[in-house]
A protein has these predicted regions:
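Bacterial N-terminal signal peptides that target proteins for export
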Residues: 2-15
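N-terminal signal peptide c-region/cleavage motif recognized by signal peptidases
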Residues: 24-25
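C-terminal non-catalytic regions of proteins with extracellular/luminal or membrane-system context
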Residues: 29-47, 53, 210, 367-371, ...
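N-terminal beta-rich core of secreted/periplasmic extracellular enzymes
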Residues: 32-274, 302-319, 336-416, 428, ...
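Short acidic, glycine/serine/threonine-rich loops at helix termini
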Residues: 167-173, 227-232, 278-285, 328-333, ...
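Short glycine/threonine-rich loop-to-helix capping motif typified by GTGT followed
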Residues: 233-235, 329-344, 375, 471, ...
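Binuclear metal-dependent hydrolase catalytic cores centered on His/Asp/Glu-rich metal-binding motifs
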Residues: 273, 280-300
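Short beta-alpha connecting loops at secondary-structure transitions
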Residues: 289-295, 330-336, 378-394, 399-411, ...
């Protein structure tokens, strides 16, 4: 017997039904699922409650939470129009007013409604600020309400770039806001403990779910084999075995276990398959001038091995790299010179065929867009660059042809675009089969069912502030920041004494005073100088959108570097401690001889740093990459090989205990 209930916003509390399952061969009692709805009516079937997502007054298999996700997904695909299927294969950027990137505090709901209701898109990256978790949660609820109001009520998958560390860079990561603040993934690699990585990712998972995020565009399984590459601080370093272990722990924590997705999971999209870190000349392939990863040797396997950690943890998503694998070969055969999102060998033959990946392949952002004119050459002086496309290797194809080539290569979903009509026309013109779209749509919808979105798309915004950035979680994050410090040199300076007079550069005076130090104004008055700096960089591509934001070029301290000048000044007068934020492997040859103590950090607050300097505990972290002795040595390195620098100043795995 079926009865119909009016739509409401309340949660249906769990209760135990005593009637047999309608579709199950087992005549056992079943616990009522918890349901959230703002738009869909509820129906009762034999004493159980379900959401009538398509509003036909019947319980359809895809609405039946008792059935397995694969069966529900197959039923839903069978009910969808071609337009709706094409929309599922888009992964848009949730729009905000006045921002091309989607930054801000509130969504542009009119623009979002167009994407959801007219283009049938139901996956979005959010770049909303995390400064107000409750507001962020309610904004994501508003997207879900728009999605629930559509013909089939397919919920939105909301994704994010990493937002729990010190780095913030558009297209890479988001400012931390109120979320727990940890060291960069390099710091987790420096600690080297897979269980700590799992705990970190598990905490991030809970924070994400609290604000309505169910997909993480992370981690990076890329090897940082080219030390000038701007994306190194999002990796786990240059060692394949260490990276594999870290990736496995990350995916396990993010997905709430090693056995695939469940109702508490956040989908982990591991990136960037494969070889991204072998960046030619250190340039990044977000930019036309950096489209190549250079393989001078047949070393692709080094870069594949870290991804096997993701496969062992049953990662649900993979994102291909923008890069063209220049000169790369596989068992002696050359690899097609197109970006990985267009490369059938890399996606279908290697990823799915040889390594058995059966999840969703989500393209990196804007691979089907054009890159012409100033996208190739940079804008003229005085003009502001804007993001374009990254269609590397297929620049001469039309956008429609790029979509077709990517789908045939193995892509399931397209990042950063919502032009679903292109896929519709390709099917109508006989250039793609609808059955091929069904395969991708089925994969994507199955994950929505697995993560519980059809039953509970909304979150309790009132609880978000209590969950995000919880005090005990931040205490663990602070402990992790401290443990990630790598002691490179210590000539009888550590531990520092409370009450010491300190001259500071790059460190907050209030934090030093709270840690028990006496702050002085000139080095001559100090017992010790404490200096914070970061890996040097250049910005030779300020006329490119991403190039203007990337830290590129030389890793060495020049004489005119203000931080280096502070080191020279202080070390001539007083024992000097220097800590370097290692976003890339710095050349420290002209720094190490001027310091009594030298510490590598991968993201640490002033207060955590200062209290660690007082502590007498041993330092246990190790470098996740080698530190070259000179830029000449860097230029001689093979971009695709790990730890091949000539006579590195500090080798991979180096770290003093005290």
């Amino acid at each position: 017997m079926t009865s119909r209930c009016a739509p409401h916003t309340a949660v249906v509390l769990p209760w135990v039904a005593t009637l047999p399952l309608l579709f199950s061969p087992l005549a056992e009692a079943v616990q009522q699922a918890t349901l959230d709805t703002r738009e869909a009516p509820l129906i009762n079937v034999d004493g159980l409650t379900f959401k009538d997502l398509n509003r036909d007054g019947k319980l359809n298999p895809y609405e039946d939470w008792r059935l397995p996700p694969a069966q529900r997904a197959a039923d839903l695909v069978s009910r969808m129009t071609l337009d709706e299927k094409a929309g599922v294969m888009m992964h848009g950027s949730a729009p905000t007013a006045g921002s091309v990137t989607g930054a801000g505090n509130q969504y542009d709901l009119n623009a979002a409604k167009t994407m959801i209701a007219e283009r049938h898109v139901n996956s979005f990256i959010t770049r909303l600020s995390g400064d107000n978790p409750a507001q962020m949660a309610e904004e994501n609820n508003k997207l879900q309400q728009l999605a629930e109001a559509t013909r089939l009520g397919i919920p939105a998958t909301i994704s994010t770039d990493p937002r729990n560390s010190f780095q913030s860079l558009v297209g890479v990561s988001v400012s931390v806001g109120k979320f727990s603040k940890w060291p960069e993934t390099l710091g987790l690699a420096a600690i080297g403990d897979e269980e700590r990585v799992r705990i970190f990712a598990d905490i991030v998972r809970q924070e994400y779910r609290a604000v309505g995020i169910t997909e993480a565009l992370s981690p990076q399984a890329d090897l940082s084999t080219e030390p000038r590459w701007p994306r190194i601080d999002g990796t786990f370093g240059e060692d394949p075995d260490l990276t594999k272990k870290m990736v496995r722990g990350y995916v396990t924590g993010m997905q709430n276990g090693k056995n695939g997705l469940n109702s508490q999971s956040v989908i982990s999209v591991v990136k960037h398959w494969v070889g991204y870190g072998a960046a030619q000349d250190g340039w990044d392939s977000h930019n036309a001038y950096g489209k190549y990863a250079l393989f001078r040797q047949n070393n692709l396997q080094w870069h594949i091995d870290p991804f096997t950690g993701a496969f062992e943890a049953h990662a649900a998503g993979i994102m291909p790299t923008y890069s063209i694998l220049r000169n790369a070969r596989w068992h002696g055969k050359p690899i097609e010179q197109v970006g990985a999102g267009f490369n059938r060998f890399l996606l279908t033959d290697l990823l799915r065929g040889q390594y058995g990946f059966d999840g969703v392949i989500l393209s990196d952002w804007l691979i089907t867009n054009d890159c012409k004119g100033d996208c190739l050459t940079g804008v003229k002086p005085g003009e502001k660059p804007v993001p374009r496309g990254m269609p590397w290797g297929v620049e001469n194809l039309t956008p429609a042809e790029r979509f077709i080539k990517a789908v045939n290569a193995g892509v399931d979903q397209f990042g950063g675009v919502t032009d679903s009509a292109v896929l519709v026309k390709a099917v109508q013109d006989g250039l793609l089969s609808e059955a091929r779209l069904d395969t991708s749509v089925n994969r994507i919808l199955k994950q929505k069912f697995q993560t519980g979105l059809f039953e509970r798309p909304y979150v309790n915004a009132g609880q978000a502030d209590d969950i995000v950035g919880r005090t005990d979680w931040q205490q663990l994050a602070d402990d992790t920041q401290a443990r990630a410090l790598v002691l490179l040199q210590n000539n009888n300076l550590l531990p520092l004494r409370k009450g010491s007079r300190v001259w500071l550069h790059g460190i907050d005076a209030k934090a030093a005073q709270e840690a028990g130090f006496v702050v002085v104004n000139v080095p001559e008055q100090a017992d010790v100088a404490l200096i914070r700096t970061h890996t040097p960089y250049e910005q030779p591509h300020k006329n490119f959108f991403f190039g203007s934001r990337h830290h590129e070029g030389s890793l060495a301290f020049r004489a005119d570097n203000p931080d280096y000048q502070a080191i020279v000044r202080a070390s001539a007068r007083v024992p000097t401690l220097v800590t370097v934020y290692m976003e890339r492997p710095a050349v420290l040859t002209n720094v190490v001889d001027k310091t009594r103590t030298l510490i590598a950090n991968f993201g640490v607050s002033d207060s955590v740093l200062l209290n660690r300097l007082i502590s007498g505990a041993a330092y246990t972290a190790k470098l996740p990459f080698e530190l070259p002795s000179s830029m000449q040595a860097v230029l001689k390195q093979q971009p695709d090989l790990p730890y091949d620098s000539d006579k590195p100043l500090f080798p991979f795995g180096y770290g003093l205990p005290h």
